[in-house]
């Protein structure tokens, strides 16, 4: 993003924690057709005002994002974004545990892991507004999942196809783009962008779309026209 308006991305990174530095990103894909189905029913964009979000700054960054149709999903594979939850910041802990430690309260850790493996904690889920108890276990861990605010498949269709493997792995593990959330709600979201999915909790929508804009600005990803319109509708209520 331009040096004159770095605050949104800088503040988002400060809230999320340290993230690996990235090299200059490759050029975006040439202009492609608008995605089929862009006229599908849009989600309710009602949002509750959020004084922590600088709406004009978000709009300024949104206006700088390229607007065009998504690329085909052909060739997408989760493995192209590296192994799940790598230790890209080299702090000795995998990314999933880093985010759990950041987003949960009353956290307990497995002994002998140097404070890396989270055993339990409480999540105030941003997507539903509910309080969720997390307990590590084969049948319980999925209650809290780590969401990519900008989904990997969405990124793939909006610029990430041309990235290096290193940049894709950075993106998949960047704390700026990660949130601990309610597992079932995360599954409902899937790879949806703002044009097709928004958090059920209206109080989170301003921060959610602000984070999406910050991530796309930081990584040079584009938005579709329907996506930009959906974000703007949310911002009108912020």
What are these regions (language model features)?
Residues 1-10:
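C-terminal region of N-terminal signal peptides and the immediate post-cleavage residues
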Residues 5, 19, 39-40:
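Compositionally biased regions
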Residues 9, 26-29, 55-62, 73, ...:
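Extracytoplasmic/secreted envelope proteins and their assembly/folding machinery
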Residues 17-22, 221-222:
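Charged, low-complexity interaction regions
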Residues 23-93, 227:
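N-terminal module-boundary/linker segments of secreted carbohydrate-active enzymes
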Residues 72-145, 149-150:
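Secreted/periplasmic proteins that engage bacterial cell-wall peptidoglycan
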């Amino acid at each position: 993003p331009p040096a004159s308006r770095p605050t949104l991305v800088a503040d988002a990174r400060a809230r999320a924690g340290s993230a690996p530095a990235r090299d200059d990103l490759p050029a975006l894909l040439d202009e492609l057709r608008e995605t089929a189905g862009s006229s599908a029913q849009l989600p309710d964009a009602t949002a509750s005002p959020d004084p922590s979000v600088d709406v004009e700054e978000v709009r300024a960054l949104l206006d700088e994002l390229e607007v065009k149709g998504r690329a085909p999903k052909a060739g997408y594979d989760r493995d192209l974004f590296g192994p799940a939850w790598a230790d890209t910041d080299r702090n000795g802990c995998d990314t999933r545990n880093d985010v759990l430690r950041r987003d949960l309260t009353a956290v307990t850790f497995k002994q002998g892991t140097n404070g890396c493996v989270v055993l339990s904690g409480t999540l105030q889920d941003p997507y539903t507004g509910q309080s969720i108890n997390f307990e590590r276990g084969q049948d319980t861990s999925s209650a809290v999942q780590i969401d990519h605010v900008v989904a990997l498949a969405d990124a793939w269709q909006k610029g990430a196809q041309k990235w290096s493997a290193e940049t894709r792995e950075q993106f998949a593990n960047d704390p700026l783009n990660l949130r601990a959330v309610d597992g079932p709600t995360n599954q409902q979201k899937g790879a949806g962008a703002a044009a097709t999915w928004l958090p059920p909790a209206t109080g989170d929508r301003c921060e959610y779309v602000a984070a999406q804009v910050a991530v796309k600005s930081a990584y040079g990803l584009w938005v579709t026209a329907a996506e930009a319109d959906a974000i703007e509708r949310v911002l009108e209520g912020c």
